[in-house]
Regions:
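Active-site loop-to-helix "anion-binding N-cap" substructures in soluble metabolic enzymes
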Residues: 1-264
Length: 264
């Protein structure tokens, strides 16, 4: 097996077939990924995680583990919406991965100083499925009691938020960083700011162990490196298994595909 991306699966080809073979092996790429993941579940502190994307259900287990391990959590992407809602901010017509109200309320109460949510967002109206056709773009600042209208969606973190996130990182002297999921609608150039700022934070903290993973955040970081003519390797280590990364963290590395290889 040479793919972290499938190790969380309980499929027969991943977790059962290796048990029938006398000769099983962990691939070089998978070994590299595991070494990176071990540095996340046994982090050098202080540590920070930038969590974006949409599906809370894919990230909530890892989020809890990261908090328990002392990580500062910085929220972006549509992941921001249930957290904003939990603090009674009006999220208008923004996408919401529902069903997590209770656990998010508890996390915000238990780790209020560790979970950082946006204070401003960039919004727009999406009247079709074409992600390039977003109209009436504007910023909404929650600290000024501004609200997202029912016909609007939050599509990126705002400049005040990313400034605060950057300042927090600088103040803490972060030694371990991870990013999973984009901070905005990166398919549309108007909403790449948040993801680009995360990439810039990674670039400016070369003293830290840095790993980012997931198709969209990898794409966002690659766009950043090309647009600003920066060597992508200067942004840290790229993991090709976004959900695999999350499941490794959530389960402390105890994944079906790895158990089958007896590599832990």
């Amino acid at each position: 097996n040479d793919a972290l991306s499938v190790c969380q699966n309980g499929d027969a080809s991943v977790s059962y077939l290796p048990q029938l073979s006398k000769n099983t092996a962990i691939g070089f790429l998978l070994k590299e990924e595991i070494n990176r993941m071990e540095k996340l579940i046994k982090p050098e502190l202080p540590a920070a995680a930038f969590l974006g994307g949409f599906k809370v259900k894919d990230k909530i287990g890892a989020l809890q583990k990261l908090l328990e391990k002392g990580f500062e959590i910085f929220i972006g992407g549509a992941m921001r919406n249930p957290f904003l809602k939990s603090q009674n901010y009006n999220i208008g017509g923004s996408k919401l991965d529902s069903g997590f109200d209770d656990i998010i309320h508890k996390l915000m109460n238990d780790f209020r100083d560790k979970i950082h949510i946006p204070v401003d967002v960039r919004v727009g109206e999406m009247k079709s499925k074409d992600k390039q056709k977003v109209s009436n773009l504007r910023y909404v600042n929650f600290l000024k009691n501004e609200e997202i209208h029912a016909n609007e969606e939050a599509l990126d973190n705002g400049p005040e938020t990313m400034k605060l996130y950057k300042e927090k990182i600088e103040q803490k002297g972060i030694k371990t960083m991870l990013a999973n999921g984009p901070f905005g609608l990166i398919e549309n150039r108007s909403f790449r700011f948040g993801t680009y700022q995360v990439a810039r934070i990674f670039l400016e903290n070369e003293q830290a162990f840095r790993v980012y993973g997931g198709g969209e955040v990898n794409h966002g970081f690659n766009l950043f490196s090309k647009e600003f003519k920066i060597d992508a390797e200067k942004l840290g280590d790229q993991c090709n298994a976004g959900n695999g990364m999350l499941q490794y963290i959530a389960n402390e590395g105890d994944l079906p595909g790895l158990r089958a290889l007896s590599c832990r």
